[in-house]
Design a protein with these regions (language model features):
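Active-site helix of classical SDR
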Residues: 194, 236
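Catalytic Tyr-X3-Lys helix of short-chain dehydrogenase/reductase
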Residues: 198, 239, 244-253, 258
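Short-chain dehydrogenase/reductase
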Residues: 1-181
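Structural signature of the Rossmann-like NAD(P)-dependent dehydrogenase/reductase core
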Residues: 64-65, 96, 161-163, 207-219, ...
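Conserved Rossmann-fold SDR core element
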Residues: 32, 251-264, 308-315
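Flexible, glycine-rich beta-alpha linker
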Residues: 14, 217-225, 248, 254-284
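C-terminal helical subdomain
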Residues: 105, 110-137, 145-146, 277-323
Length: 323
């Protein structure tokens, strides 16, 4: 909407295409959008992506927004997987779509988890288009929708009915495969993207170039309280923060690239399903939404274009905060 030619990545490209095409103002910008289907847990796909992006010419902005916080059970992905098997609409203008291999298999080993051990969420009789519309509608994940069995979150995921997930697990409980997935998605993929796309950013004619690493409070060392849960997620975000702190000053001094780590704020609740229902019944919900989170991620770029150079810092609530 600000005039950029934009590439976005996702494991579910057809779902993304449907969402963007359904936007009321899509005709104004959809010809400048490319949707890339990729699994960022696969470093070979990440490297291939960097080669394609670099070959396309100079790059002004890189936002490392992908994240795996907890692994969900396969049933949560049901509508998204089904949507990848269904045809795209023919009555709307669609963005360009590029897809790498093996991005959203029905039950890939990396998300299969405990399929036989836990209830699997599902919606019967819903089309991909109707599921997309439901995910984009207000109240789609309300307590009432959960109790009625019709909840879908803004990412298109069904409620994960497992009573335990890695958000509450301690170091001896976290599955080794999930540990690896989280590191690959949250810190290894951003490292590869930054390192291999730096020449393309250096070639940009823009006054400033930007790298925004989407971080979280989980990776903050100076926080007064740090519980024992989800150590694998904490260490992944801490690694992303250290990458930012280590490389940002040199990247700015050498190439005028402004790199920051940004906390989106509390926009999701990762606790197990029954815990979420209990606190929702008590009136609690995440204080921010996806629009709030996106605004915080975009803000360092807006500031830079206004002449305020922000780099080498952890940004929370729109201002630098302690690491």
């Amino acid at each position: 909407r600000d005039g950029a030619t934009t590439t976005i990545t996702t494991r579910f490209p057809k779902d993304a295409v449907r969402r963007f095409a359904a936007m009321p103002d899509a005709a104004d910008w959809i010809d400048r959008l490319t949707v890339v289907g990729i699994d960022l847990r696969d470093p070979t796909q990440v490297i291939s992506l960097t080669e394609e992006v670099a070959a396309a010419g100079p790059l002004d902005i890189l936002v490392n927004n992908a994240c795996q916080t907890v692994r969900r059970s396969p049933g949560s992905y049901g509508p998204l997987v089904d949507g990848e098997l269904a045809p795209l609409p023919t009555d709307l203008a669609l963005p360009e779509m590029v897809t790498f291999d093996r991005i959203s298999e029905l039950h890939p080993a990396s998300i299969a988890g405990t399929l036989r051990e836990h209830p699997v969420a599902h919606h019967l009789g819903e089309s991909p288009a109707s599921m997309t519309a439901l995910a984009l509608s207000a109240g789609n994940a309300s307590l009432e929708a959960h109790l009625a069995g019709t909840a879908v979150d803004a990412g298109g995921l069904l409620p994960d009915l497992q009573r335990v997930n890695s958000w509450t697990q301690k170091v001896e409980d976290v599955d080794p495969l999930e540990l690896l997935e989280v590191q690959l998605c949250n810190s290894i993929a951003p490292f590869l993207l930054i390192s291999r796309l730096r020449p393309a950013m250096r070639a940009s004619a823009a006054r400033r170039r930007y790298v925004v690493n989407v971080s979280a409070m989980e990776g903050q060392f100076s926080r007064r309280y740090k519980g024992a849960g989800h150590p694998h997620t904490n260490m992944a975000k801490a690694a992303l923060n250290m990458l930012t702190r280590t490389s940002a000053e040199e990247m700015f001094e050498t190439d005028r690239i402004l790199m920051t780590a940004v906390d989106t704020g509390w926009i999701t609740d990762e606790r197990p399903h029954q815990d979420k229902l209990r606190i929702a019944a008590e009136g609690w919900h995440a204080p921010l939404d996806l629009v709030d989170g996106a605004a915080r991620v975009y803000d360092p770029i807006v500031l830079g274009e206004r002449g305020e150079d922000l780099y080498g810092c952890f940004v929370k609530d729109y201002r630098p905060s302690p690491w």
